[in-house]
């Protein structure tokens, strides 16, 4: 059980909690840094809906201040293997932006997190983007995070009054193995999190999508058990 419970009068931070490993570690780090966590999970009608259950489990284990699961049906737009009837690639991590990229997803999600933060009187957002062991999504890059901070300064009441909004991306330059070790250091249960984009009918992770491959390799390099049941080899 994590032991980083913040003080009752600690500042609030909105943490995007997808239910994946990176977002779980991000929430744990926010607590370790002394923030009370407002966890925001977006139910965008994604293919891998099991990650919503993972987000609930993580929020409960961490004892966050509040956990909101916000419905936003991005299947109405499509354009991604996660939100449309497009096959999830199973042939390894490539160099091009894959079809699992959801158009502008992190921009949309951070905008919603910013709205909640402003309503709650918070000036801190946390997002678990990573620019090393990742699938090449453009909205995981450092320049995206820096650009969103600039946008938040222009678009919000706190910014217009001379304040700042900080977007914390503490995993941005970590390898997946380092993220796995952070989970262990924080006392988090890796098995609470979910990474697979295309779960098997029996509930196991496919084991061969980009996200599974990155997770498996990271935990193997770290010498840790990731608590996931895999199929697919």
Curated annotation (Swiss-Prot):
Described purpose of this protein according to its UniProt entry: Catalyzes the ATP-dependent conversion of 7-carboxy-7-deazaguanine (CDG) to 7-cyano-7-deazaguanine (preQ(0)).
Protein name as it appears in the record: 7-cyano-7-deazaguanine synthase
What pathway annotation does it carry?
Purine metabolism; 7-cyano-7-deazaguanine biosynthesis
Q: Which residues bind ATP?
A: 17-27
Gene (UniProt): queC
Give the enzyme's EC designation: 6.3.4.20
**Family as reported in the entry's similarity comment:** Belongs to the QueC family.
User: What Pfam families does this protein map onto?
Assistant: QueC
| Source species | Novosphingobium aromaticivorans (strain ATCC 700278 / DSM 12444 / CCUG 56034 / CIP 105152 / NBRC 16084 / F199)
Q: Which UniProt keywords apply?
A: ATP-binding, Ligase, Metal-binding, Nucleotide-binding, Queuosine biosynthesis, Zinc
InterPro entries the record matches? QueC (IPR018317), Rossmann-like_a/b/a_fold (IPR014729)
């Amino acid at each position: 059980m994590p032991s980083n419970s913040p003080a009752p009068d600690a500042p609030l931070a909105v943490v995007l909690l997808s239910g994946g490993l990176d977002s779980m570690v991000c929430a744990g780090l926010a607590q370790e840094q002394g923030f009370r966590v407002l966890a925001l999970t977006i139910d965008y009608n994604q293919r891998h809906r099991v990650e919503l259950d993972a987000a609930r489990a993580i929020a409960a284990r961490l004892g966050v201040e509040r956990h909101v699961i916000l419905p936003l049906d991005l299947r109405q737009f499509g354009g991604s293997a996660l939100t449309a009837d497009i096959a999830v690639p199973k042939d390894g991590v490539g160099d091009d932006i894959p079809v699992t990229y959801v158009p502008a997803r992190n921009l949309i999600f951070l905008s919603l997190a910013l709205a909640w933060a402003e309503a709650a009187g918070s000036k801190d957002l946390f997002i678990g983007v990573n620019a090393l062991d990742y699938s090449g999504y453009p909205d995981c890059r450092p320049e995206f995070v820096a650009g969103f901070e600039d946008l938040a300064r222009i678009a919000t009441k706190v910014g217009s009054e001379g304040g700042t909004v900080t977007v914390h991306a503490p995993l941005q330059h970590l390898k997946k193995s380092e993220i796995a070790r952070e989970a262990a250091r924080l006392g988090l249960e890796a098995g609470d999190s979910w990474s697979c984009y295309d779960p098997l009918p029996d509930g196991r992770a496919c084991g061969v999508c980009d996200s599974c491959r990155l997770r498996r390799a990271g935990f193997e390099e770290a010498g840790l058990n990731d608590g996931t049941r895999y199929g697919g080899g």
